[in-house]
Regions:
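Actinobacteria-biased recognition of intrinsically disordered, low-complexity terminal regions
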Residues: 1-24, 163-192, 552
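Membrane-anchoring hydrophobic segments
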Residues: 1-110
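Hydrophobic alpha-helical membrane-embedded or membrane-associated segments
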Residues: 26-37, 94, 119, 141-149, ...
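Helical transmembrane-bundle signal
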Residues: 38-42, 98, 123, 213, ...
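Structured, non-membrane catalytic/scaffold regions adjacent to prosthetic-group chemistry
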Residues: 43, 47, 52, 95-96, ...
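Membrane-embedded alpha-helical segments of integral membrane proteins
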Residues: 82-179
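Hydrophobic multi-pass inner-membrane translocation pores used for secretion
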Residues: 178, 182, 212-226, 501
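N-terminal secretory signal peptides and thylakoid transit peptides that target proteins
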Residues: 188-209
Length: 552
């Protein structure tokens, strides 16, 4: 038998104390309604595509709209987990919003319905107008909003059950037309004389939670059919016509120095900085690279067209993100496989008036690369292989651009589907629109890997070691300073290629005490790394990496 509780406050007159007592349950109802909405949205997104997910769409919009200092702070604070932090932050905001709507709906259900509908419209607009969006991508958010409204009304009903004193009024209302009863239901809220049906509320809550989990889980399962991991694993890469230079024996100092960065970065550890909340999935059979703009004529290439070329090259190249701070880890080296970019552009009749290549990703991202670098940098390439395997999906599968000597935001377009030969006057790419420098050659950089900052270690002889890079120029020397002493020359790993970073090591005898260690590099052309500090925005960081350590 269902029991209905009447708040003592109802007997004494004022409704506020009774309403305050139900606010936690109303907030929970709002949260559960949001869960149902998100679950339904994910279910429909599973039928359409990952880009249509309401959370992803809103997150993409946030990335587009937030100021650059906020993005820089997120990357510096969360590193490669910045997207996870964004999704978590989005969900927290949704949860707070939903809880407030639940409390408002306790007084007037229309407020909750309007609030959920508004959020659905915002999500639908974000999905439909996103770089890779379309009208169909609005459906998950709209379906989620509808499910959320139904869930909210169902959850609010047990919180405002008419008591015996109000039963006659409700009985009289039953004879009213349907439209009037619906309006009354939406506007009713916490009416005078209403009670609380706890059992019904908890049963409805359990059903809502189950629906949210079931639909959300089903949506995740459906999204797996878009995964291209299997197709990537089956892709056969061609042998290079021009292999990478052979590495001399003992080239990787990390094999004998603990804590030193390896010469090559494993794919799973290679840094990833981009704006894609969900990694784009392109099936090899569907891939097409379009050339437009200032070429002899427009043309498209399939992946087989690129893989079947006779001029495939293999090169060892270090990439660096412009967001890398002094001493940061947003740099990595891989053995890349692809076709020479300069020859490819000339073959397609690129015109002399073009000074910018507008590179387009499948997710709508645009990267502006200087045409001159693409043509003149010897090892610039369209890459489809990384460290002996097809490009990882996270790093641009099936094709990306690699131009040594330039920060990634003006060269390393991932999931590349279009190249437009254009000019800087005619088009501002994504980052240029946000006031980053239009052209940004990588600055000379060096880093201390070991000992770690603030590390305590036994006094005695110990290796100070790290890496340094100056792509296209090469590293000619690395020096280390202990406290305010003289600059001491470090030993360098063999120079394999000017585009590849060099490891360095300096054995040093430490007496007990605290020490400040500083490193600087000199390019093979004789340019000394600047001591002037600069933040990553707008053209890359500069300054010397310095740490404090303690010998005991």
């Amino acid at each position: 038998m269902t029991t209905t509780e009447q708040s003592p406050a109802a007997a004494t007159g004022p409704d506020a104390p009774r309403r305050r007592g139900r606010r936690p349950l109303a907030a929970a109802a709002g949260l559960l309604s949001a869960g149902v909405a998100l679950g339904a949205g994910e279910l429909v997104a599973g039928l359409i595509g990952p880009q249509s997910s309401p959370v992803v769409a809103v997150g993409d919009t946030v990335i587009t709209l937030v100021p650059e200092p906020v993005k820089a702070f997120a990357i510096a604070t969360f590193g490669e987990s910045d997207k996870i932090a964004l999704v978590v932050g989005t969900l927290v905001v949704i949860a707070l919003y939903a809880a407030v709507l639940g409390v408002l709906a306790l007084r007037r259900r229309t407020a909750g319905v309007v609030g959920i509908t508004l959020f659905g419209v915002v999500g639908a607009a974000a999905a439909a107008t996103g770089p890779a969006g379309g009208p169909l991508d609005a459906l998950p958010a709209l379906a989620g909003a509808l499910a959320g409204v139904v869930a909210l009304l169902a959850l609010m009903a047990p919180l405002t059950v008419p008591t015996a004193g109000a039963a006659q009024t409700r009985s009289d209302d039953d004879g009213a037309p349907l439209a009037e009863r619906l309006r009354a239901s939406l506007g009713a809220g916490d009416r005078k004389g209403a009670g609380l049906d706890r059992r019904r509320f908890f049963l409805t809550s359990a059903a809502a939670a189950g629906a949210a989990v079931a639909t959300g889980g089903a949506g995740r399962l459906l999204l797996r059919r878009f995964d291209v991991g299997g197709a990537r694993a089956d892709l056969a890469l061609p042998a290079p016509a021009s292999p990478a230079a052979a590495l001399p024996a003992g080239a990787d100092l990390a094999e004998r120095i603990d804590g030193l960065t390896p010469l090559f970065t494993p794919n799973r550890e290679f840094y990833r900085v981009d704006t894609a909340i969900t990694v784009p999935q392109i099936r090899p059979a569907d891939y097409e690279l379009s050339l437009t703009g200032m070429f002899g004529s427009p043309r498209s290439y399939t992946l087989d067209d690129l893989l079947g070329r006779s001029d495939v090259i293999e090169r060892d190249i270090t990439l660096t993100c412009v967001s890398n701070t002094v001493g940061g880890r947003l740099a990595g080296t891989a053995r890349w496989l692809g076709i020479p970019l300069g020859a490819f552009l000339r073959e397609n009749g690129i015109r002399s008036g073009s000074d910018q290549l507008v590179c387009r990703s499948v997710d709508g991202m645009t990267i502006g690369a200087p045409t001159r670098s693409a043509l003149e940098v010897e090892d610039a390439m369209l890459a489809f292989g990384m460290n002996g395997e097809p490009l990882p999906v996270e790093h641009g599968f099936p094709v990306r651009m690699v131009i040594p000597g330039l920060y990634g935001y003006v060269s390393a377009c991932k999931w590349l589907t279009g190249i437009e030969a254009s000019t800087y006057d005619a088009f501002d790419a994504y980052w240029t629109e946000r006031d980053w420098a239009a052209q940004a050659p990588i600055r000379i950089a060096s880093r201390i890997d070991t000992p770690a900052p603030l590390r305590r270690f036994p006094a005695g002889r110990r290796a100070i070691a790290g890496v340094a890079w100056a792509q296209t120029r090469g590293i000619g020397a690395v020096e280390v300073r202990v406290d305010d002493g003289p600059w001491l020359p470090a030993q360098l790993s063999p120079q394999v290629d000017a585009d590849l970073w060099r490891q360095w090591v300096l054995p040093h005898d430490f007496a007990p005490g605290s020490y400040q260690l500083t490193v600087r590099a000199t390019s093979a052309e004789g340019e000394v790394q600047t001591e002037e500090r600069a933040e990553p925005f707008p053209a890359g960081s500069s300054g010397l990496h310095s740490i404090r350590v303690n010998a005991t």
